[in-house]
Amino acid sequence: MPIGVPKVPFRLPGEEDAVWVDIYNRLYRERLLFLGQRVDDEIANQLIGIMMYLNGEDDSKEMFMYINSPGGSVVAGIAVFDAMQYVGPDVTTICMGMAASMGSFILMGGEMTKRIALPHARVMIHQPASSYYDGQAGECLMEAEEVLKLRDCIAKVYMNRTGQPGWVIYRDMDRDIFMSALEAKSYGIVDLVGEDPTATPSVWFRWPSLLDSKDSNEK
């Protein structure tokens, strides 16, 4: 039987009594974002809205985006990527489980030197596929041309952010390429593997701030 989204206590600044909020809203207050599903317009708009709010609240305090996604909509993924580049704070990306297709594109969009994969994470890249239309015959050519433009756009971003030459990116995008965390680091999609001793400890040990007593919430 599903248990729904867990709720945790949260004490608003200046309040004596805690209220129960869903765990993701609590974590958002700590600037921890989660992409744990297929990339679609709904989750993209949620993530973009949260990033814009946090950017307005403090445009210098780092955000952390945890990713476990099989990919999804190309346009929605590009929107999240662009929002990550737009906001003032660094966005650290952390891959847990799988970052495939647009999931890997968003992973790669984190702040350079702050893109991380956990030791057993998997990363996959391939060329974009899209469907704007409902199969109308007269629109097929139009869609094919748009997909080619998106493919070139995504390939250029991969080239710029991984350091790989264009021929390697286009070759690898022609098929599904799966990588381990270490292979993704060698490829340039991530900068650190979770067990790497150079990984910043603060990325992993922000949890005490979630459990702080009344004093921390009232500062």
From Swiss-Prot:
Active site location: S101, H126
Biological function: Cleaves peptides in various proteins in a process that requires ATP hydrolysis. Has a chymotrypsin-like activity. Plays a major role in the degradation of misfolded proteins.
Keywords for the protein's UniProt record, in alphabetical order: Chloroplast, Hydrolase, Plastid, Protease, Serine protease
SUPFAM superfamilies: ClpP/crotonase
InterPro entries: ClpP, ClpP/crotonase-like_dom_sf, ClpP/TepA, ClpP_His_AS, ClpP_Ser_AS
Catalytic activity entry: Hydrolysis of proteins to small peptides in the presence of ATP and magnesium. alpha-casein is the usual test substrate. In the absence of ATP, only oligopeptides shorter than five residues are hydrolyzed (such as succinyl-Leu-Tyr-|-NHMec, and Leu-Tyr-Leu-|-Tyr-Trp, in which cleavage of the -Tyr-|-Leu- and -Tyr-|-Trp bonds also occurs)
GO cellular component labels: chloroplast stroma; endopeptidase Clp complex
Main location: plastid
Signal peptide annotation: none
UniProt cross-references to CDD domains, sorted A to Z: S14_ClpP_2
Record localization: Plastid, Chloroplast stroma
Enzyme class: hydrolase
Entry-linked PANTHER family: ATP-DEPENDENT CLP PROTEASE PROTEOLYTIC SUBUNIT (PTHR10381), CHLOROPLASTIC ATP-DEPENDENT CLP PROTEASE PROTEOLYTIC SUBUNIT 1 (PTHR10381:SF15)
One example of a Gene Ontology biological process annotation: protein quality control for misfolded or incompletely synthesized proteins
Entries under Pfam families matching the protein: CLP_protease (PF00574)
Keyword Transcription in annotation: no
This enzyme's EC code(s): 3.4.21.92
Assembly mode: Component of the chloroplastic Clp protease core complex.
Disulfide links within the chain: none
Name of the protein in its database record: ATP-dependent Clp protease proteolytic subunit
Stated family: Belongs to the peptidase S14 family.
Molecular function GO terms recorded: ATP-dependent peptidase activity; ATPase binding; serine-type endopeptidase activity
